[in-house]
């Protein structure tokens, strides 16, 4: 799945029973003032927040991911525009990629240049095309 500036509501969180490991690429702007990255009255936060488990952590646990690394998202050689958290070594070879974009609000990024931090359609396709319903594609 590939949510962009979306969070998981309490009802979904309480009733979700995924039978498959789920590859997830999530992109969210830190400046989003519509669906706050830290959650809100109807939505869970994306990351752990006190005693409330975050959405990414929820899926990391379902997918049984064992490795994590974080890297800077660069625009050009000298400008960091956010961070990319990558959870890997997960069940069925799936991954979770969490793009946290510093100067982005609640808008769709598409060009990858100028005011658009990343080309979201390309990021989504490059990620999801690596998987099937059963997990990671086997390279031939």
Q: How should these model regions be labeled?
A:
Residues 1-140:
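Flexible, surface-exposed loop/gating regions in the mature catalytic domains
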């Amino acid at each position: 799945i590939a949510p962009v500036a979306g969070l998981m509501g309490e009802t979904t969180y309480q009733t979700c029973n995924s039978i498959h490991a789920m590859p997830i690429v999530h992109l969210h702007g830190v400046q989003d003032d519509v669906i706050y990255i830290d959650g809100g009255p109807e939505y869970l936060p994306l990351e752990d927040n006190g005693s409330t488990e975050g959405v990414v952590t929820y899926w990391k646990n379902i997918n049984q991911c064992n490795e994590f690394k974080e890297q800077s998202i660069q625009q050009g050689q000298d400008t960091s525009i956010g961070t990319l958290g990558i959870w890997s070594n997960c069940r069925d070879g799936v991954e979770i990629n969490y793009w946290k974009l510093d100067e982005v609000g609640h808008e769709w990024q598409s060009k990858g240049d100028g005011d658009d931090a990343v080309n979201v359609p390309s990021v989504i396709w490059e990620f999801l095309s690596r998987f099937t319903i059963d997990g990671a594609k086997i390279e031939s």
